[in-house]
């Protein structure tokens, strides 16, 4: 396996700019791409481990849905102290799954990890104490989000937690534009050019459709979660928890 490289996928002009996909090219540079594109990503990954340590129950299942290269899975695996837990990491990208398995296998642990190549909408969720959707739900078509969240709720044990990280939109137009501009400033500060920012935005706008924080909270509450709150936010990116 080649080491992860620097993200320059959108550095040169692309004549026919298709929709963004999590293919081999993206998998090879994903760690660099996500660190330079998502403000606070490392903090979120670290805190997912902390939350898993608090909420993982003995002999339960932990799900990382849309696991990409396994950063959240590894954070939880390092943190979980409970006996008999199993982590099920799922992604529909063959390139991501292949590299995820290599990353997972590079670390020894008493907590087994099953890496599954599948559509997260088709995964059975049962006996779960922790479920993670780390910047994943936003890539599902909006009409499938409720169904997946209902399935997660049904598969969680009472007292279990859903950790939901997403990019957000805002109803206040001035605030929305300011937070987008601050995010672009963040990307510029991390070495992305105007061309890269523009081309990435065009490629991803048809496949990533963010919701507002209020939409997330309303949906989770209607499904039955007893406690929902944003625990981290930086610009228009953040993470929420929802407790059953």
From Swiss-Prot:
Record's keyword annotation contains Transferase: yes
UniProt keyword annotation of DNA repair present: no
GO molecular function terms attached to this record: carboxyl- or carbamoyltransferase activity; S-adenosyl-L-methionine binding
Residues that hold S-adenosyl-L-methionine according to the record: 41, 66-68, 91-92, 119-120, 134, 201
Reactions listed under catalytic activity: prephenate + S-adenosyl-L-methionine = carboxy-S-adenosyl-L-methionine + 3-phenylpyruvate + H2O
Subunit structure and binding partners: Homodimer.
Protein family per UniProt: Belongs to the class I-like SAM-binding methyltransferase superfamily. Cx-SAM synthase family.
UniProt protein name: Carboxy-S-adenosyl-L-methionine synthase
Organism name: Photobacterium profundum (strain SS9)
Lineage: Bacteria, Pseudomonadati, Pseudomonadota, Gammaproteobacteria, Vibrionales
């Amino acid at each position: 396996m080649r080491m992860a490289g620097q993200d320059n996928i959108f550095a040169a002009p692309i004549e026919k700019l298709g929709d963004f996909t999590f293919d081999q090219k993206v998998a090879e540079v994903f760690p660099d791409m996500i660190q330079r594109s998502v403000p606070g990503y490392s903090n979120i990954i670290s805190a997912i481990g902390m939350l898993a340590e608090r909420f993982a129950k003995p002999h339960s299942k932990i799900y990382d849905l849309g696991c990409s290269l396994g950063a959240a899975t590894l954070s939880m695996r390092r943190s979980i102290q409970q006996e008999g837990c199993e982590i099920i990491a799922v992604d529909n990208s063959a390139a991501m799954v292949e590299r995820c398995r290599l990353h997972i296998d590079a670390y020894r642990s008493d907590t087994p990890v099953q890496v599954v190549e599948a559509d997260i909408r088709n995964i059975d969720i049962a006996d779960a104490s922790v479920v993670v959707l780390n910047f994943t739900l936003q890539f599902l078509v909006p009409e499938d989000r409720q169904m997946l969240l209902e399935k997660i709720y049904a598969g969680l044990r009472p007292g279990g937690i859903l950790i939901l990280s997403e990019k957000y939109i805002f109803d206040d137009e001035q605030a929305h534009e300011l937070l987008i501009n601050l995010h672009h400033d963040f990307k510029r500060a991390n070495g992305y050019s105007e061309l890269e920012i523009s081309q990435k935005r065009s490629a991803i706008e048809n496949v990533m459709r963010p919701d507002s924080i209020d939409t997330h909270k309303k949906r989770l509450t209607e499904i039955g979660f007893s406690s929902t709150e944003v625990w981290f936010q930086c610009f228009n990116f953040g993470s929420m928890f929802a407790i059953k």
